[in-house]
């Protein structure tokens, strides 16, 4: 079972390493070698650590951090959903996504959005997200990647 905890600034390097491993393993074939190298260069202190101030979470299995996920409340956007390669296909990504959606529901957010990497579109579709049009993602670091903007309506429980 995945234990999910809120990330702290001290978790930035751990989260960055999960991201790097996941991209290098799961995005091969969807993006060029040059894009992959640019995407995974650097270190957490290059700006990734600032994400820890948002609704950023780590997923743990037997004391090991194996997944990350974030909900940007300013944009109702899901992001940074990564799972270590050795743990993919076991439902941990879905569990983290469900957690992020639950956080959104608790804040009465009716729809969440995301920019799916080309290799992750079918995963998100399987989780109820819709979107087909390919677009271009511009990262804060200047990286340009093809993506598919997707959205999911959430059922928000009325207050009683």
Report each predicted region and the residues it spans.
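Residue-level recognition of the GNAT/N-acetyltransferase active site
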Residues: 84-88, 115-117
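Residue-level detector of beta-propeller blades
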Residues: 65, 131-133
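Extreme N-terminal starter segment of soluble prokaryotic enzymes
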Residues: 1-3
């Amino acid at each position: 079972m995945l234990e999910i905890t809120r990330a702290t600034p001290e978790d930035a390097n751990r989260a960055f390493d999960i991201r790097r491993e996941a991209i290098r393993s799961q995005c091969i074939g969807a993006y060029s070698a040059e894009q992959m190298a640019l995407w995974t260069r650097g270190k957490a202190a290059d700006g990734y650590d600032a994400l820890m101030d948002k609704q950023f979470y780590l997923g743990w299995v037997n004391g090991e951090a194996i997944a990350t996920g974030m909900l940007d409340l300013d944009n109702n956007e899901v992001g940074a959903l990564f799972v270590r390669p050795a743990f993919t296909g076991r439902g941990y990504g879905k569990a983290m996504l469900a957690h992020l959606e639950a956080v959104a529901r608790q804040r009465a957010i009716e729809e969440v959005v995301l920019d799916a990497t080309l290799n992750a579109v079918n995963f998100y579709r399987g989780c109820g997200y819709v979107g087909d049009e390919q677009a271009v993602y511009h990262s804060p670091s200047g990286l340009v990647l093809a993506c598919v903007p997707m959205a999911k309506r959430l059922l928000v429980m009325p207050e009683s």
